[in-house]
Amino acid sequence: MVIGGGLLQVPVIQTAQKMGLRVIVTDYNPNALGMKYADIPIVMSTRDIEGSVRVAKKQHEITPISGVLTVGTDASATVAAVANALNLPGIKFEDAIAATNKIKMRTRFFEHGVPSPHFFPVWSLSDAKKACKVLGFPVVIKPSDNMGARGVVRIDNKNQIADAFAFAKSASPSGELIIEEFMEGHELSIDAVVFNGEVTFTGIADRVIEYPPHFVETGHTMPSQLPKEMQDSACEVMKAGIKALGIHLGCAKGDIKITKDGPKIGELAARLSGGFMSAYTYPLSTGVNLMRAAIEIALGQEPGNLEPLYNRVSIERAIITRPGIVKKICCVEEALKIPGIAEIFINVKPGDKVKKPTSNVEKAGHIIAVADTLEEAEDAVRKCKEMINIEICDESELSMDTINISARERLRKVCYVCKQCNGKDCASGVPGMGGAGSGASFKRNSEALLNYKINTRVIHDVTNPDTSSSLFGIHLSFPVMAAPITGAVTNLGGAIDELDYNIAVVKGCMDAGTIAFLGDGADPEKYKIAMEALHQFGGMGIPIFKPRANNDEIIKRIKAAEEAGAVAVGMDIDAIVFKTMELKHQAVKPKSLSELKSILSSTHLPFILKGIMNPRDAAMAVEAGAHALVVSNHGGRVLDEMVGTMDVLEDIVREVRGHIHILIDGGFRTGVDILKALALGAEYVLIGRPVAIAAVGMGSEAVAYYLKTLQAELKKAMILTGCATINDITSDIVRKIHHNSYQPLEIR
């Protein structure tokens, strides 16, 4: 059982499988890379100790577990708890806690006479000031319960204490901090394996620490270039620390400072190192698979031969860009062909906002090289950095032009990113970004909007209109939300990962002060990706599910949305004949009034029916108990030759206004378009394709930028029509200029 399913756990998962073992992987993120490799993936936070023990016991009854470990995560306590609960090889839980909590760790070292800095536990700013007074400057403040240099900062004088305290506090899950002496000197990172109390040191690397007053590791060199006697003395100190922490079986990773007073322990963890050392640079340098040794020990077996097969130099160096927004990334595949380059990991994607790093988790990427000499390895990294192009633009340079250019490059022939997104020149249909059949329904949405023109009012005192609104108790900066879109591969041609898309839209909407609707998709498992995005952002979104033939499948998705903390849920009830569902062989069917009532009764969340196009269905939505409806023809994607949503809005408003919230989508592209819909009685507007284009182009930053642009346009339109608030927008500010031949159905 491997606790943690991130990138750094993949090598140990793969090694275990090569050893003929079945691997259970637990991680909070169901889409974590390691979960894809797992034989048995289990969604569980690595920090949830009780939950991890519970699922381990349950799984143990089905598939007996023979060992448990982690690599590169701060989950040693979870590993120990599971091992103790299942009577597996491991260390005591209290020892694992001491190897995780920096205050308990320092206390153990003090009690056993292990060289380490003097320290004080800190809870309040007053505590911090007292500690600084006793220790003297410089000191280091850090969370007692985090890793990756998060919240770690040097304090050089009393004027820096308050800001440093706040910075460290923000990175501490518990709020507990530690202040300790600053140790000047070269730093080593050392891995060791321990079996029956016998310690075997494996990799010893030189750490490169930069970006003061923070402590950002920008790389390491394997093996260390320090004299052997210095390395040996560091190992002796680490061995004393291992004994003090009670690590008699398993692995240990130490950060050792070579100070003027001799080696001192900075950190010591009951696991192998992260930072690409134990899993990448060590085996490249020595030919020894340390993951195999860790697995053998976790199974209670003596590790195999750990003698190096050769002695090469392997280095890891961080890719750090200038601050700004990632515009494009290219030439990574070409850079991998440079002699000596073993691996390249890119942590950012277009649209990500990057800043000057303050911790080890804020780097744009990593390069791993191997050669016979340090000079050759460094030269390979230099060439690699010169070739890789991570183009950054300043936030001030962000514009719809830069967003659209980036999106056009990524979407290629799926979407031309036309200047006017109105369906007239679409590159694709369904699947894709276009409309069904001839695309007439998609086009009609835009044409229907053009039937209405604005009638200005300019003698008034409105200078700063209030665009705010609210839905189901959620404050909105303006009554516009992202429409549900799914199918990153099916509809967007793989231009963006499905989870990345959902995250970009949810985060972008939140940054703009509104919320996103999320799609279900034809793939029966795809809804879980939307749920993951909701989990990450506190449920700030509204998932819309397909009208699947089996109502239990709909209710299952609703329950998942409840668990994710969703604001509301809904169903795009018009997707009863939909091409992408047919392609995936997913059964859908219309819902009767009684079925709708049954589905709605299954949840306490507000329920939205999307796909209403006539007063009759609107009235039945009210009768079913829906809290909101969306006037929508599915972006013209379910049927050709449909009327536009603005063609029917007034009739629906007359039928159900005051009984249900009324939303609308379909061709809305500008603040003026939004004003028209609000004037005719819609309370909220959903926008789909332009938001998707922004998300593909430059991620959440672009989504937020686009939505804020719409809000600014709406404000200008409100000023020119004398509307101080959203409630002041009335039908007398629009005029219909074309005859509309649509006749609403008579309700009998």
Language-model features: where?
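Peripheral (often C-terminal) accessory segments that flank ATP-dependent C-N-forming ligase machineries
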Residues: 128, 295-397
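A conserved helix-loop-beta module that forms one wall/lid of the active-site cleft
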Residues: 84-151, 158
